[in-house]
Regions:
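Outer-membrane beta-barrel pore domains
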Residues: 37-38, 88, 191-193, 201, ...
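Outer membrane beta-barrel
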Residues: 3-207, 281-314, 318-336
Length: 401
């Protein structure tokens, strides 16, 4: 048994059965400026509070179980939820089978660990993708890690949504798949070693109001677009998301694009009436860059400081600067049949800058300055949030082990 900044680890004598206990706590402060007289609430928020249990049972089986006790993105209290509950059977690195509830295998930023994202909140690209779903996938790594793949069947959920239960809302399933290539991964001394690129996609059929996204949010987690309450998904849904990243020493970069399509009707069909359905295609892109001022390597899994912060010894951990641009555009056909002009933006453009201070492998302080501009079809919105640019200063204290 060992206990350190990576958590509590227990292992059998032969090492075939292991248990790791960890946690993730993210405490945020959100301050909004220029919102026209206190429209947005400045507040403290327990964004995430999770207990993490993972390990192995025998030679080929591993598991992950994560309950969520935090407030989530909305800033209001929530019930305890099972975030991840998955079992993986891995006969080889090339062929592994995963069953349960886990992140949908689509987006590069979405698949990044929640403690390791460059900014405290993900971009619009992740808003147009599902979060966690229930299903089964086959995954693996080939050619020494130069190519990895995932493909499988999942229940299927709306954009920016986590499956809330163990059952599906209709009789159909979604097919999810992703390919990721790192062609120079074997040459660690090459400046091309950190290049990665790939594509994720999903396709299926969905029916019901629950298959329509509950809304898209800004970096400050304010809803700027939401379909009408009666809008009914009925037919094909699909997503495609090309993606790439690059890491070289202290430099890191990540870029992603997504198209998310759904067929919808203004209301649910009845035995006598079925209003025409329309395919809507919403699109988003993002570019994120980072640089570690203290010289440590940037990576997809975060920054590990050479020396932890120690006032007496004069060591300061690692300091990273980050910046990003992002944009999301709603299909013009959404207005006004499926979304009201007065209460929704048709486009949101945002930029952000910030820094991350890694006091140790387990403790991180972050501060992000983020601004979002809205386009509202050339009309004056009635929603106060859309009348002004969103300017937010978000500070986070994070403990992760």
């Amino acid at each position: 048994m060992t206990a350190d900044e990576k958590g509590l680890n227990v292992s059998s004598a032969d090492g075939s059965t292991t248990l790791h206990l960890g946690a993730l706590v993210q405490f945020d402060s959100r301050e909004f400026f220029g919102d026209g007289g206190g429209v947005l609430n400045n507040s403290f928020l327990l964004r995430r509070a999770r207990l993490i249990s993972d390990g192995t049972i025998g030679k080929y089986t591993s598991y992950l179980f994560v309950p969520e006790f935090g407030n989530g993105s909305g800033g209001t209290a929530t019930t305890v939820a099972i975030l991840d509950a998955a079992v993986t059977v891995a006969p080889t690195t090339a062929v592994q089978f995963k069953f349960g509830k886990f992140k949908s295998p689509l987006g590069l930023e979405e698949l990044q660990g929640d403690p390791n994202t460059n900014f405290v909140e993900r971009t619009f690209v992740s808003s147009l993708l599902p979060n966690r779903d229930v299903g089964a996938v086959v995954t693996g790594s080939l050619f020494g890690g130069a190519l990895s793949y995932t493909a499988g069947l999942l229940n299927g959920i709306a954009d920016s949504t986590t499956a809330s239960g163990n059952s599906d809302f209709d009789n159909d399933r979604d097919v999810d798949a992703r390919l990721w290539a790192q062609p120079f991964v074997a040459d660690k001394d090459s400046p091309l070693w950190g290049i990665g690129f790939g594509v994720g996609g999903s396709a299926g059929r969905e029916k019901g109001t629950s298959a329509v996204t509950a809304g898209y949010k800004t970096d400050g987690q304010q809803t700027f677009f939401k379909y009408g309450s009666s809008v009914y998904a009925d037919g094909e849904v699909w997503r495609i998301t090309p993606q790439a990243s690059y890491y070289y020493g202290p430099l890191g970069a990540l870029a992603e694009y997504v198209v998310s399509a759904v067929n919808v009707r203004p209301s649910a069909p009845t035995a006598t009436t079925a209003l025409p359905k329309t395919q809507l295609e919403n699109k988003a892109w993002e570019i994120t860059g980072s640089y570690v001022l203290t010289g440590e390597d940037a990576s997809y899994s975060g920054v590990a400081p050479r020396e932890p912060f120690n006032w007496a010894n004069g060591t300061w951990g690692a300091l990273q600067l980050v910046g990003r641009l992002e944009d999301v555009r709603i299909d013009p056909k959404a207005f006004p049949t499926f979304a009201a002009f007065a209460t929704n933006a048709n486009e949101a453009r945002a930029w952000g800058a910030g820094f991350n201070w890694y006091l140790s492998r387990a403790v991180r302080l972050s501060q992000d300055f983020l601004q979002t501009r809205f386009s509202t079809n050339g009309r004056l919105p009635t929603t106060q949030i859309l009348l002004h640019n969103e300017t937010a200063l978000i500070t986070r204290v994070q403990l992760s082990f």
